Amino acid sequence: MAGNIVKWWKHKILGGYKQFTVLQECATDSEELIYPGRAPSACSAPPDLLLTSDREQMLKVKSSASTGSGTGQTKTSFQHSHHHHHHGHHHQSPSSNGHNHSGTSHQQQQQQQHHHHHKSQKDAFRKCTNGKAGGGNATAGGASGAGATNTINTTAATIRSDPDRVRLEEFTCDVSLEDGKKPQPLQFSFTLYDLDGHGKITKDDIAGIVSTIYESIGKSVVVPHYGSKTINVRLTVSPDGKTATTKPASAAVKKAIITPRRRYRSRKLISDDDGSDTSENCPRLLRNRTAATAVTNNGETANNNQAALQNQQQQQQQQHHHHHHHHSNGSSGKLKESNLSKATALAGDNQVNRSIGLSNSSEGSSAVGQLLVEAYHKNNLSPGAANAGAGKGVLNNAPNATKSKANENVYESINNLKCCNLQQQQQQHTASNNTSLQTTASSLPVTATGLNQSTTSTAALICHDCVDGGAPTTTLLPPLSTLETVVIPAPSAGVTGRAKRKLVRKTRASRKTAIAAKMMSEDFARRPRARSLSVGNENCYENVIGRMAAAQEECWKSSLCRRELIEIIRESMVKNSLCFQPNRRKEHHRLAAAVGATRSTQPTPVKLSTALLNQQYPNLSAEQKLTRSINQVEQWLDHRSPKLVPKVKLADDMQLQRTVVSRPLKRSKSKEELTPSNLLLLENLKISEDIAEIAVVTPKKVYNKESLIASATKKNIKTHHQHQHSPSRQPTAVPTVAIGAEKPSAPLTVVNKQSIPVGDAQLVQLQYGSVPINADPSECENLIRMSDDGEDVEQHQHQQHQQQQQTAPMAATKHSYRHHQPQSRSQPQSPQHHQHHHQQEPRYCGSGRAHSVSSASAASTTAVHRYVHEHIHHHYHHFENDPDES
């Protein structure tokens, strides 16, 4: 199938390069812009979280793995397989570019399909890639095949695991156009924020990335008619607290790809300690195997493959590395520019390079992702003589093999940074460290070539970062320190300028590497980076040198920054009515608990935090909140609270009112003002119960009339007896207005607005529709208004006091007052109200509760509305408007 796909893509590309996605139902145009023939994202489904990166990685890794299906050499195999595969397809395809593109498209399609059909596609790709890789390069293909299989499996595993562990991550997109052999590097840093909490990358996210790239380079890129142009796009995803594995699994392919071909290489930065063991380790193992394909890291094809691969790879990469090396030299700027991402991807490539023993120069610069690898790569260069420096000559093949093995080990130690092969790497990196130090030191001069130097400097930078960041990593640290020591010469080797450039890019890679190393080696390393809040700017290209020193700190800071960002975003989200209900619920539970704790006596009113209120009333604009002035709220409360307040309470309330009257908030009719503390306790209990219940039931206090009323009808009466139990709810200090509907007739039962007069509680806890609401009196206006009429008689007396206090709500007050005076009158108007009054008194006794429940269920909404209209038209209208507003 893979062969057919490749052929199909070949024809598509050669027959006229058409950008369309094969298996992408959900692909976006922008995505397709980036991935011309590839399905960039196979639908941003949760499994696709990193699938975009995974997909890209898979394109690299899987396609390369498919191309070079192997267990240990995903990158190597991708590189070799692709490299060879591309060569094979070069032979097959009219043009190597077309072939490469075709191969890329094939890989893309494979990845797409693979992405959609991870297993079957992987197998098919694996087979196809294996065949191709095998055909292209027996040794590389074989080793690659092994690596590719692992990589594919790894990718699959990673993809499988990633949905669980995938986090939006920082995407560093290095786009390089190769015009002639000159790369035109561009770097983009995309920070994706998981604002919706699903932790998945959406097509829009990728589309934005693609759009950015397209806008940056799309218009400037001219693709020959029926020809192909290679756009090397490396998409690296900073690991979610996991090492960034460079799964662009093709150094050789990359080189081959350097030929016109669209490469979208995404590093699988999610080195799953779990799934990545397969994927990351496989890439790493693949790198190790690839790099050490003979390096006996896996001991499988290690030595033979290494010799063969190194020889072949050296030769091939000397071939390609020559032309790639030239490309890489020509594209060294590109590599350097995109070196960070590429280095990350090329970390795998370097692994490949190591296993290939190939071009440190071309891949070396791209080794940035794995500066250690780069150092190792350079080590390979030294031992491998660059795989002869640029793969240009096998300077020291025997030493290269030996050093290469040692370097492989070192690289494995690097992989330890990159992956969980810590044991082998630990074992190996000790010996390898020495070798790699030596080889790195030697290879640095060998790779003193600008590209390699920059790579080396990059490696040094990353090594520093890794060493700094990886220092916690015992395994990585020795190799890192060793590499660091060696690498330090590299940057000092006159690579400093490039090192700075790369360092900028490498900083991210080094950060990632260091972070990965730390994460890998430490629990701190395990500390996932805030998934959605990875800030690409932390990896600013500036502070390149500072990054080396800061890399370690950044490893720590990045999480802190992300956490801060998360908090900031969360706050903004809350402000934007994107309240986190779990938090709100927690708050409510806390409040309820506190209320329960203090229920025995009227708790001291406690103001609810504005944050709580905002969460509860996410929709209220500041204007609305302000508009609902406390005076208005107090007016409503004044009208309403008397209704709820029993006459005994009225007396207390009068006292409270008198107190309240002196209070600036005269209007606050809150029963709390008027109501004696015992009444407050009643209502507090009611409120606390309702709130606790609401906290659980309706985290988002929805204040629509219907919902509130419905809730109220359910919970109206509930806490009247409870007030004895949980006056502590009042402790929330919000003058509590139980608006709600203990009884449908009194849906707007006003819980005592406990101390609006007191002043401690500016917040009113409204119980509307049995939904206790902690809110400012202004916010509670609507609910309070509705509850006014529910307690006409009680409020009548209260209102008398309140009216004395307030004239502003005179009409309403009179209206309520009227209801209060002839409680029977208001009751006849609303039989429910009648019941409500009967219940109001019993309701505090708890009898009203059952009644309100029954009536609530029966007439809940209609009764409430009717009652409200009859008793508080203006209030009702306000309520009607305000709840809608709120």
From Swiss-Prot:
Tell me the keywords, alphabetical order.
Cell membrane, Cytoplasm, Developmental protein, Membrane, Metal-binding, Nucleus, Wnt signaling pathway
Q: Which GO terms describe its biological process?
A: negative regulation of canonical Wnt signaling pathway; negative regulation of Wnt signaling pathway; Wnt signaling pathway
Xref: PANTHER family: PROTEIN NAKED CUTICLE (PTHR22611:SF9)
What function does the entry list?
Answer: Cell autonomous antagonist of the canonical Wnt signaling pathway. May activate a second Wnt signaling pathway that controls planar cell polarity. Required for neuroblast specification.
Q: State where composition is biased (Gly residues).
A: 132-145
Q: Where is it localised?
A: Cell membrane; Cytoplasm; Nucleus
Which portions of the chain have biased composition (kind: Basic residues)?
80-92, 319-328
Q: Which domain of life is it from?
A: Eukaryota
Q: What species is this protein from?
A: Anopheles gambiae
Residue span(s) of domain EF-hand: 181-216
Q: What is its main location?
A: membrane
The record's family statement is: Belongs to the NKD family.
Query: What is the name listed in the Swiss-Prot or TrEMBL entry for this protein?
Result: Protein naked cuticle homolog
Instruction: State the Gene Ontology terms under molecular function.
Output: calcium ion binding
Q: Tell me yes or no: is Transferase among this UniProt entry's keywords.
A: no
